[in-house]
């Protein structure tokens, strides 16, 4: 349950106050010790903090501004709608650096899209049909893409 307050509550950034409250209650029920077989105080604390911020218009506006700055700085985000989708298989992988790269389909910058493995781990969200997804911006232009991938575990 990592990510933004929106990710924690499982809501869209434009969610109405009623949706925020309903998601908060649902997440608390899901995190309840009787449902989880134990107490994860960290999860409950994150849910409560997300609700406190997103249910207060002033705090939410300030948080949205901070989130926008963070997204602009990293060029990677976990959620968005109406973007072109690509598979991580479309990217080239540099094993030494642990980075996936792809030329931008709009501006043709050779490594316009760069996804370090850590960015995938920290920013990915689950896709409704299974697998994971991350949103990334071209380093040379304003194009954003959804990048879909599956987590594959290998035994070493």
UniProtKB/Swiss-Prot annotation:
DPH-type MB domain segment(s): 82-150
Location in or out of the cell: Cytoplasm; Nucleus
Pathway: Protein modification; peptidyl-diphthamide biosynthesis
PROSITE patterns per the UniProt record, alphabetical: DNAJ_2, DPH_MB
Pfam families reported for this sequence: DnaJ, Zn_ribbon_CSL
Main localization (coarse): cytoplasm
GO molecular function: ferrous iron binding
Residues of the J domain: 4-67
Binding-site positions, Zn(2+): 104, 107, 138, 141
Keyword Cell membrane: no
Recorded superkingdom: Eukaryota
GO biological process: protein histidyl modification to diphthamide
UniProtKB keywords: Cytoplasm, Iron, Metal-binding, Nucleus, Zinc
Gene Ontology CC entries for this record: cytoplasm; nucleus
Function: Required for the first step of diphthamide biosynthesis, the transfer of 3-amino-3-carboxypropyl from S-adenosyl-L-methionine to a histidine residue. Diphthamide is a post-translational modification of histidine which occurs in elongation factor 2.
PANTHER family assigned: DIPHTHAMIDE BIOSYNTHESIS PROTEIN 4, DPH3 HOMOLOG-RELATED
Family, similarity comment: Belongs to the DPH4 family.
Record comment regarding domains: The DPH-type metal-binding (MB) domain can bind either zinc or iron ions.
Protein name per UniProt: Diphthamide biosynthesis protein 4
